[in-house]
Regions:
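Catalytic core of membrane glycerolipid acyltransferases/transacylases, capturing the structured
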Residues: 1-29
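Non-catalytic C-terminal accessory region of glycerolipid acyltransferases
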Residues: 33-137
Length: 137
């Protein structure tokens, strides 16, 4: 989660109680390492770790953005599956806009993706999300 969210009054304070892994998106390598190290620790403590591989919402017409490899590396290192989740919130909650449009956000949860190759895990998750995204938009 981008660390800027944690300083939003009330909302950020409440979210911080969930022990999120906050990252500085300007420091990409440091942030990736933090997700891998802190995410691995959380998994070993019994927590589920939610990774947003694109890093931001997009408009449906912009399609799926570039995926970071953190989800594949984390799943491979910790020998846990990736549970892909796809949603269309970008259709109503436009990025960099205060305005939120009303509508139903669809969320689809896929089957576990299991493997040991981080790149293949990431690509399989991306492929499923891309296909599902086109179906729900």
């Amino acid at each position: 989660m981008k660390r800027e969210i944690l300083i939003i009054p009330f909302f950020g304070w409440a979210i911080s109680r969930l022990k999120p892994i906050s990252i500085n998106r300007k420091l990409k390598i440091e942030s990736l390492k933090r997700v891998i190290v802190d995410g691995g620790q959380r998994i070993r403590e019994g927590y589920a770790v939610l990774v947003f591989p694109e890093g931001t919402r997009k408009k449906p017409e912009d399609g799926i953005g570039r995926f970071g490899n953190s989800c594949g590396v984390l799943a491979s290192n910790e020998a846990v599956p990736i549970i892909p989740i796809c949603h269309n919130s970008g259709k109503y909650w436009v990025n960099k806009s205060f305005k939120k449009n009303s509508g139903d956000i669809n969320i689809v949860i896929g089957k576990p993706i299991i493997g040991s190759d981080p790149k293949k895990l990431t690509e399989e998750a991306r492929s499923w999300i891309e296909k599902t995204y086109s179906e729900i938009n």
